[in-house]
Swiss-Prot record:
One GO process term, biological-process aspect: thiamine biosynthetic process
UniProt keyword list: Isoprene biosynthesis, Magnesium, Metal-binding, Thiamine biosynthesis, Thiamine pyrophosphate, Transferase
Coiled coil regions in record: none
GO cellular component: cytosol
Record HAMAP family: DXP_synth
Bridged cysteine pairs (disulfide): none
Annotated organism of origin: Helicobacter pylori (strain ATCC 700392 / 26695) (Campylobacter pylori)
Lineage: Bacteria, Pseudomonadati, Campylobacterota, Epsilonproteobacteria, Campylobacterales
GO MF term set: 1-deoxy-D-xylulose-5-phosphate synthase activity; magnesium ion binding; thiamine pyrophosphate binding
Chemical reaction(s) catalysed: D-glyceraldehyde 3-phosphate + pyruvate + H(+) = 1-deoxy-D-xylulose 5-phosphate + CO2
EC number(s) per entry: 2.2.1.7
PROSITE patterns the UniProt entry points to: TRANSKETOLASE_1, TRANSKETOLASE_2
The name this protein goes by in its record: 1-deoxy-D-xylulose-5-phosphate synthase
Amino acid sequence: MILQNKTFDLNPNDIAGLELVCQTLRNRILEVVSANGGHLSSSLGAVELIVGMHALFDCQKNPFIFDTSHQAYAHKLLTGRFESFSTLRQFKGLSGFTKPSESAYDYFIAGHSSTSVSIGVGVAKAFCLKQALGMPIALLGDGSISAGIFYEALNELGDRKYPMIMILNDNEMSISTPIGALSKALSQLMKGPFYQSFRSKVKKILSTLPESVNYLASRFEESFKLITPGVFFEELGINYIGPINGHDLSAIIETLKLAKELKEPVLIHAQTLKGKGYKIAEGRYEKWHGVGPFDLDTGLSKKSKSAILSPTEAYSNTLLELAKKDEKIVGVTAAMPSGTGLDKLIDAYPLRFFDVAIAEQHALTSSSAMAKEGFKPFVSIYSTFLQRAYDSIVHDACISSLPIKLAIDRAGIVGEDGETHQGLLDVSYLRSIPNMVIFAPRDNETLKNAVRFANEHDSSPCAFRYPRGSFALKEGVFEPSGFVLGQSELLKKEGEILLIGYGNGVGRAHLVQLALKEKNIECALLDLRFLKPLDPNLSAIVAPYQKLYVFSDNYKLGGVASAILEFLSEQNILKPVKSFEIIDEFIMHGNTALVEKSLGLDTESLTDAILKDLGQER
């Protein structure tokens, strides 16, 4: 196989050669991720599995489907991207996830968890209809099996018996480690040809026996299966092989050969170590899952920690403060306790905070039930993952107007994770739902007040959003004030045009305001605060101004400017309104500042756009 300037011979019979390939791949992953940041530990842990897959299968005839795909770095290196891997997660460089537009070897876009088996079932159905050779091969992590879509796909797969290989990469994040010699012996038995042949023959024999005898024989087989791993999968009609050592290339190759011959759905349970090959990261799951640039020798971050709290920290600190005084506060997250800041609250009040795993729909529905019972559930969730729970928001929270509180983290452009993780949709779909209150803070201090308002709001569901990393508005520029339902805040009154900011858009609008002032153009500045309900006095507030310019980190369609235009139209008020929201396309990965500049959302571009609209030149 040609890797641009590298040539590797992936001979499945040359285990020593494959091990050298694995070491080369690990070295390259460490070299690049230490410089760029990325998903390190999962990618290091999956190297042997991916090398084994490529050694035995042509991935263009047997599509490789990577669940979430943050573990697919070795796959990228083995498919012509060894040299360009240095651009990983950089603006206009390689994506940190599989991306068909980047390479024909990347079968499917990925970034969210638990979709691989469902995709594989779809591929298998299509292959059967086309009478195509080959079968899909899905590599998924053990965390992925907590989501409902995984079981929905297994249900059909076990019933239809489509040929498909699933490799369950168990790095001890969710699945218990088998214990003792019996488990090891049964594993060797189950992955061997004797066991598979035995199972096949027993099934054939049982099918020929009279019903009375068949019942006793079936009970014998059930007893045999109960002492083996993987009973659950076998009961669904999925062949189970394992556990195997996911770093033992001999075991991987032999197991994949067996799975290939079965021509049925097979799940291979492979145990791996996250961070394999980098001692500092081995076994330290949370710290080394997603990392920024770091020193390869010491493991220390190359970026010094900011003295200013991140929005996530400001949120979680405030929630902890409130939780100490209010026993009705409960916290819910979907497999992201650290990312959403709930880890410290779980430590303080473990009985009142719930990590429901990768189950966003369940998070929202169960939270709605807790709200009905008088509790105050704060559902802490990334914007990109909230969209997976849309029906639960509508059906279970909003129809009954149950006062759940949606704390929407990573709202707006998120940077290096790209299309699958941008937090740009929540504004548009949430504002369309009756009974939903939607608001946004402009900085850390108003975020703290937003949490306090949400805690007291008890008449309906509410949602507030905040960005990744930091707000655009520096702390202390404007005095913080509390939230009052449906009230905006006019931060600067003087001017002929009005800049309207929503959430993080206030900071962007303020920077433009300062730039225009240097051009002797005075602008008023409004912090919209509430998107739903809008300030009932909005028509009076905007009346003195000739033009309105709207700034917000969300899609333009169905966004903040749309809401303002709808409101003014109902009041029979005609005002020129220009939106500086996100254009109607999926936004690529890269440094946030570079991405914003490419979209014309940096201060210089925004200032020029307003000057042009006003008929002036810079």
